[in-house]
Amino acid sequence: MCIRDRYASLIVPNMVIIRNFIEIFQAEALWIPGVSLLDGIAYDYAEKNKYLKSVHNFENDILVASRNIAKRYSSGKNHIAGTTDVALDIFDSTRKIHGMGKRERLLLQIAVLLHDCGKYISMSEVAECSYRIIMATEIIGLSTEERQVIASAVRYNTREFGCYKEINRETSMSRENYLLTAKLTAILRLANAMDRSHYQKVKALNVTLKDRILYLVVDSARDVSLELGLLKDKKEFFEEVFGIRLVMRRKGRR
């Protein structure tokens, strides 16, 4: 077998590393891919420029990684599931208004998954602790800018949303990402308020957009006075961000 000179000097160091891995993990077998770093760079370039379409669902990998982070910090699984359903219903029903796409939908899902992880550190500073956890944790598949957007949406879920100069001073966030953060925050606030008690009282939520009015009709057999009251508190910011009216009521009532 003929080995190129530029690769020959790498053989011994690689063998040492591989041997150590085998000994540390007591591996019985070792699988080595037949690709190099350059292959990965070429593939990434081709996919981003739409020269080829990936058959692997990388977004699912990102969501799995985010769920593992939420699990590590003991986030409420049922609360997250309920809040995610509501957030995605609102997102999908307002596509014509907000202009966001598939990638932004993914960022919203991750924000919901991680919005409560700060409780593991402090019950009084949940939003700030969640922000710091997200910014300190690498999530494979997300850029630093995307993590900043997610972390900021989580931070302003319960904090007053500042002006661009104020947020930019701390995060160096672009205007485009500032607007994206505002949109995700507005949706996250509404979705989180729908399960503020963490009891999953809302059986179903009918979201309809008509003539720039978003109707939220809550279906529940339980008392949802707390949730509807909190929705009114989040209404003003949502209307300001999206430029539409928000009408909320319980099913069967006018």
List PLM regions with ranges:
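Flexible glycine-/small-residue-rich
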Residues: V112, V218-S220, R250
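Helical "lid/coupling" subdomains associated with nucleotide-phosphate turnover
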Residues: R4-R189, D195-H198, L209-R212, L216, ...
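Low-complexity, glycine/alanine/valine/leucine- and proline-rich hydrophobic stretches
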Residues: M194-L246
